[in-house]
Amino acid sequence: MATMRRICFLFVFNLAVATSTQGISDEISPDIPETSQAVIDGHRLKGSSKVSKATTGSEERFIRSQLQFLINKIFGARGVAKVLVEEGPKSGVFNKLKEILVKISKFEMKGDMLYMVYIYTILFLSIPIILGVAMYINHHVESSYIH
């Protein structure tokens, strides 16, 4: 069970890192102000002391609750989830996960992002098959030495 949680965490973390390097910020809906786009990209505009948020308060709470639910399912510990959700906004990974959740909830994923989700889903689903084949081969190799 702990191995499955680690695999799930690595899947989500790798998805966030991969999307941050793929530049999906170009696909963000145009209704987000430029200042918010700069925050999502991890940059701060010069001369702006206050930067507007990309989402409204209710959307932010919904996204945080969805993210906390996801992390609770993966880790099964509310303490870990609370720290990750509350401290996460300081890191770029939280923004990418938030972006993914928004895109999934609005079904606006397209192009490279959708392709990445398909690839990661296929890889994620193939892990048990690969492990099963490896265990099967290992069992037969070990049993051939015994006989």
Swiss-Prot record:
Top-level taxon: Eukaryota
Motif residue range(s): dEER: 58-61
Topology class, membrane: Single-pass type I membrane protein
Gene Ontology CC terms, in alphabetical order: extracellular region; host cell membrane; membrane
Keyword ATP-binding: no
Keyword Ribonucleoprotein assigned: no
Transmembrane segments: 117-137
Signal peptide positions (record): 1-23
Chief subcellular location: secreted
Record comment regarding domains: Has the canonical EER motif, but lacks the canonical translocation motif RxLR, which characterizes most oomycete effectors identified so far.
Oligomer and partners: Interacts with host transcription factor NAC069.
Family: Belongs to the RxLR effector family.
Name of this chain's protein: Secreted RxLR effector protein BLN04
Source species of the chain: Bremia lactucae (Lettuce downy mildew)
Lineage, top ranks: Eukaryota, Sar, Stramenopiles, Oomycota, Peronosporales
Gene label: BLN04
